[in-house]
Structure formats: structure tokens, C-alpha cells
Amino acid sequence: IIVDGKNIITEITKAKAKVKSFSESIIIGDYKGFSGKKISDVVNIGIGGSDLGPSMVVESLSHYKTHLNTHFISNVDGDHINEILNKVNPETTLFIVVSKTFTTIETLTNAKSVKNWFLKAANVNDISKHFIAVSSNIEEVIDFGIDPNNIFPMWDWVGGRYSLWSSVGISISLSIGYEKFNQLLEGARKMDSHFRNSEFSDNIPVMMACLSLWYNNFFDYRTHAIIPYSENLKSFSKYLQQASMESNGKQTDRSNNLIEYQTCLLYTSD
């Protein structure tokens, strides 16, 4: 697969290998914090697709949880941050800062707050052992104090709402183990293959898209309720709201012409 003249399969393979190696070193305890203790908690700092997707999967697949406790910070609400930080020990916590540009205001505000909290128990040189990043802005990440070896790629061609299947999913890999994470990737690959290769009459995504347009434009049904029976899937509707409505809820087409029909249903939950 060629994007901008590059074979992205090579880059993807390298990224997967790096996620695998790092995840396994944390899980088995080879990777140590500044005091020599093993990592016990992981805190993902992101917003939008850098938070909704990973947090949904970690919650949904909690039955496969490793010994690591995984937390997510997205809201700039100070009470929310303090609630998470009160649960963790700076000596045994790994922080993942996820931002493609490393300039996202909410994410950087939270990352700086967490960094200040961490430095009350450690020194600046210890940041490299407890903070990693998923980003394309290498310079800004290094300025933050993160070890260049602990920067995971986030490519421009990966949309945020699909990013859980990229290096952004490292929190998933840490939470359930790389092998389970790789099974998730394989499931996504199989669905991609089904969509690309199946006839429209047997193509599940195509049929769902046609039904959505049909009900929206011909029956005037404007909402689609997503109500999971499994409690572990309670956050799935939030993720789907962003994935579907941000992808399909457009006013103009690719040629910037105004669209004269409804392009997306309003997704709701319980």
C-alpha cells in the first residue's frame, strides 16, 4: 500500500513491533520506573479519538486485563485529573501523551498538570522513564522531556476516530497484552477485506450504509439508538457517535458542492 510515495506496510510493521516490544517489557516487569519499581498503572492522556477509542476497547475487553491498571484523562476538569492522580503512585505509573501535533490544547494542558504533579516526587531526568508519546511532532515531544526512543508514530493518514488500531492503541496493548491487541487488529483487517472484496449484495458495511440513507431520507427517521446489552460495551455508543457522525455528517461533498440530502443519522444511547 503506497501513500505519498511510501510503502506504509513497512512503517506499520515497524510500529507494531515497537508497540509489542514496549508493551511486553512493561507487562513482564523488565521496564522499571525511576525508583527501580515495576510499572503498576498506565494513564492515557488524550482527547477525541485519542481517548474515546482506546478507553472504549479497554473497558469492553476488561476480561482480558493484565495486572496493569489503565486510566484515561481527557477532560481539563481539575477534579477529574485529581481523582485519577489520587489513585496512582508516581514511582510506578506510566503516562502516555497522545496528540498528533503535540499542540492540542486540552491534551497538553492535562499533560503539563500531570508533569507538575510528577515532579513533586521526582526530578526532570526521571520524566523520560515515566512519560511516552504517540505523536508526529518529534521536536515538541522531546522538548517536553520525553525520550526519543519512547515516541510512537502517528501518521497524517490515520484519522483520529480510527486511531485505536494504530500506535494510539498502545494503552490497549498494555491493558490486555499485545497478543490480544493483535487479534483486534486482525479482526479489523478481516472486515476491511470483506468491505473491499465482497459484492454489494453481500457487503455488510454497504448494506448498513444503504439502510441508514433509506431510513433517514425516505422514512424521515433521524435518530439511531445504540443500546448495548453487555455492560462492558456501555461506552461503545459514545465511540460510535464520533466515528459515524464525524465521518458521515457532512454538508458538502468531495468537490465542495452542497449536499441536498441527509448524510447521517443522529446516534443516541441509553
Predicted feature descriptions by range:
Residues 117-269:
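Active-site phosphate/pyrophosphate-binding segments
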Residues 49, 76-77, 100-103, 135-140, ...:
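Acidic, glycine-rich active-site loops and adjacent beta-strand->loop/helix elements
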Residues 1-34:
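Extended, charge-enriched "interface" segments that sit outside catalytic cores
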Residues 21-27, 55-60, 108-119, 242-248:
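Short, well-ordered amphipathic alpha-helices
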Residues 18-29, 37, 78-91:
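N-terminal small/polar loop signature for handling phosphorylated ligands or for N-terminal nucleophile
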Residues 53, 57, 81, 97-100, ...:
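Extended, hydrophobic alpha-helical segments in both membrane/secreted and soluble proteins
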Residues 41-91, 227, 232-266:
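Anionic-ligand anchoring segments at beta-strand to alpha-helix junctions in alpha/beta enzyme folds, i.e.
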Residues 2-11, 39-43, 67-70, 91-103, ...:
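Glycine- and acidic
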